[in-house]
Amino acid sequence: NIEQIPALIVEKEEWEGRPHPTVIFLHGFQSGKEHNLHYAYNLVNQGVRVVLPDAHLHGERDDGADFARMSANFWKIVLTSIHELKRIYTALKEEGLLMDGKVGVGGTSMGAITTYGALASYRWIDVAVAMMGNAHYELLAQGQLDYFKKKGLQLPVDQSVIDELFKMLERVDLSKHLDRLNQRPLFIWHGEQDVIVPFSVTELLMKEITPLYEGTTH
């Protein structure tokens, strides 16, 4: 565990206890840290230490929540992960495991969504990877609400809670704070046929951020 957060550290034996390029990799919705070991092994083979934490209500933190309750808590999970990223980073730094300029954050699906929020929140992230994610938090949240209404589903919260959630999301919505990218390297991948997280929103993000990277070497 790192700061009481269940996590795996995947590394070569000779890196143990030493400063080394490190990536914190975040799993998707209803997944867990062990399900992303293939990403970790590939990154380790490329010379990168990987930290795999379990998100709130996932993996070792599963409290038996069904799909409906987990879906209703989606944004709480994302916001909790953003907060916990700072705790993980601080703990790794205090243990002398990080190298200046060599700290990355990445993830798939919900993990990629969290990565975008982390980029809007933390300057210590040097490089990021987002696969099948969505940086437009308010747009995604509104789409989820519209979906629930269309299906005739009643959310177990009142409107004031929803309003407060949107205020919290605005603070970490990368699409509203693109200047916070500060031209940091960001690898984005998204399949056009994705039916869970719309590809169109990633396409929109690419159009929004491309001008911000003009003049960079890559």
Stretches with model-predicted labels:
Residues 42-66:
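Conserved alpha/beta-hydrolase
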Residues 29-41:
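The serine-hydrolase catalytic nucleophile loop
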Residues 88-147:
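Primarily recognizes the serine-hydrolase "nucleophile elbow" in alpha/beta-hydrolase
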Residues 39, 198-209:
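Short alpha-helix in the alpha/beta-hydrolase fold that links the catalytic acid
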Residues 71-96:
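Alpha/beta-hydrolase active-site loop
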Residues 1-17:
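N-terminal cap/lid segment of alpha/beta-hydrolase-fold proteins
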Residues 18-28:
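Short beta-strand element of the alpha/beta-hydrolase
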Residues 139-198:
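The feature captures the conserved acid-bearing segment of alpha/beta-hydrolase catalytic domains
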